[in-house]
Amino acid sequence: MLAILDYKAGNQTSVRRALDHLGIPCVITADPEVIQGAAGVIFPGVGAAGQAMNELVTTGLDEVLRRQVQAGRPLLGICVGCQIMLDYSQENDTKALGIIPGECRLFNPAWTDEDGAPIRVPHMGWNHIVQRRPCELLKGIEPEAEFYFVHSYYPAPPEEYVIATCTYGAEFCAIHGGPGLWAVQFHPEKSGRPGLRLLANFHRYCTEAADAQ
């Protein structure tokens, strides 16, 4: 079973619908015992980084997530969840979880697209990613696959944590982390077949990791 973290800055219902479609057992929960007993945790997020961190700290879920990582249990951050897994976000001058090194930065409105026009912020719509290193999440997903993005800020971890990039005015990190600890800037639950495959890959990894214990 996968646990979807329940706090006031997430799009938990959309994630659950995607997992239900795949036939993957899941529960939306803020219960630390349920989270600890899950094969893996999905950490979605929408809205502002500061608000999301406030909710996590107020409920104590920030420490629950840190313990999840310290115990080596799989975690997948989505959108704002992806951003606040880093040390810091420029949005609201937010001290974040510090699970993965790096910071989250605002898109530069002076950047231009391939036609020379200034980019619009937020980055909203479908875009393809470029895989930079092997990743279990991307197994079986075509290189030309597109994912759905909605964000004004982008993650900027150290190069060794960058798994895939996307280009919007400039190249930015679209997936970061490492085995069992991943963060995706796009919304897999809204990305059609490629997004569903990514979620299925995460579940498979979690199941295999749990069976190996």
Swiss-Prot record:
UniProt entry keywords in alphabetical sequence: Amino-acid biosynthesis, Cytoplasm, Glutamine amidotransferase, Histidine biosynthesis, Hydrolase, Lyase
Domain of life: Bacteria
EC number(s) stated in the UniProt entry for this protein: 4.3.2.10, 3.5.1.2
Pathway: Amino-acid biosynthesis; L-histidine biosynthesis; L-histidine from 5-phospho-alpha-D-ribose 1-diphosphate: step 5/9
Main location: cytoplasm
Reactions it catalyzes: 5-[(5-phospho-1-deoxy-D-ribulos-1-ylimino)methylamino]-1-(5-phospho-beta-D-ribosyl)imidazole-4-carboxamide + L-glutamine = D-erythro-1-(imidazol-4-yl)glycerol 3-phosphate + 5-amino-1-(5-phospho-beta-D-ribosyl)imidazole-4-carboxamide + L-glutamate + H(+); L-glutamine + H2O = L-glutamate + NH4(+)
One Pfam family matching this protein: GATase
SUPFAM superfamilies per record: Class I glutamine amidotransferase-like
GO biological process, one term: L-histidine biosynthetic process
Compartment annotation: Cytoplasm
All copies of domain Glutamine amidotransferase type-1, residue ranges: 1-212
Active site: C79, H187, E189
InterPro entries: Class_I_gatase-like, GATASE, Imidazole-glycPsynth_HisH
GO terms of molecular function: glutaminase activity; imidazoleglycerol-phosphate synthase activity; lyase activity
CC annotations in GO: cytoplasm
Quaternary state and interactors: Heterodimer of HisH and HisF.
Cited function: IGPS catalyzes the conversion of PRFAR and glutamine to IGP, AICAR and glutamate. The HisH subunit catalyzes the hydrolysis of glutamine to glutamate and ammonia as part of the synthesis of IGP and AICAR. The resulting ammonia molecule is channeled to the active site of HisF.
Protein name from the UniProt record: Imidazole glycerol phosphate synthase subunit HisH
Species of provenance: Nitratidesulfovibrio vulgaris (strain ATCC 29579 / DSM 644 / CCUG 34227 / NCIMB 8303 / VKM B-1760 / Hildenborough)
